[in-house]
């Protein structure tokens, strides 16, 4: 996809904030605990390679991605850290992972048996690193029965495998109601207790667990996802227990400004009509950039002041009402701080009827990323 370097719309990524957030989490964990930095979905929209590089120099012990292609992109850019693919990979493509030293999630005995048979023919030069997924209640992927899990562990003794880890994922760790979370913890403990010897990476904690359930962590590794990017996994349901700093800000600038006469309408559908003469500015950003079309009627920040979006958000542009004349080139903040005011990813998510995760990951590759750090 074309990257809009010649357009004044950018996602500002603060790598110092990323580093700070990792250290904030690390200092409240037991000594020798490992952090896996979750960099799937283009590092939650912030840029896979720069974020992965920063995470690995800031205390992370490894990386997590969603699909094998993301892991191979890391390898192609010289990042050789332990990298776990959290989703299911086909048995055939697992040979590629083995050669690249990429760790795969496996959630069934059948998958292991198929790879075992394939390896007898293909004879891979390296063992496949495996993390066994435990479905303790998420209902997505993983072993649900201890007996099948133990059979899988036994099969991992074969030379074509390396039993590197085991993990689960909590469905409600970001909820004030802890009942279902506690049920999942109990199921997880059953799987852990079934092994006489644990693999090097044992991880049960996601971002929410690391924030609100640290006392329950009976593992040596935590996966740091949305919290690494300075966002609250619960939205506003639970108060943050760490001093997290937002990593990304979405900014643009005024590309065109004019005085709109009373009675004139703006944008598709003519849904907004000026009641009096007013200043109107156009911004070079739209829903094709990941700024939701449903934000019509919401607000942005200009010179520390909230300004309303006028009319419908277009594919590539949008219009805003100004309190007074501002020249072309004036900065506009769509997500982030301006003066004493701020629009957060959670603010945008609430307006759009979604979660802050989706706001970040929907920012398209057409939006140029600018990375800032002090060292």
Swiss-Prot record:
Superkingdom of origin: Bacteria
Gene Ontology, cellular component aspect: cytosol
Species of origin: Limosilactobacillus reuteri (strain DSM 20016) (Lactobacillus reuteri)
Taxonomic classification: Bacteria, Bacillati, Bacillota, Bacilli, Lactobacillales
Name recorded for this polypeptide: Alanine racemase
Active site: 40, 268
Cofactor: pyridoxal 5'-phosphate
Xref: PROSITE patterns: ALANINE_RACEMASE
Annotated GO MF terms: alanine racemase activity; pyridoxal phosphate binding
EC identifiers of the protein: 5.1.1.1
Family from the record: Belongs to the alanine racemase family.
Sites bearing N6-(pyridoxal phosphate)lysine, chain numbering: 40
Pfam families hit by this protein: Ala_racemase_C, Ala_racemase_N
Keyword terms, alphabetized: Isomerase, Pyridoxal phosphate
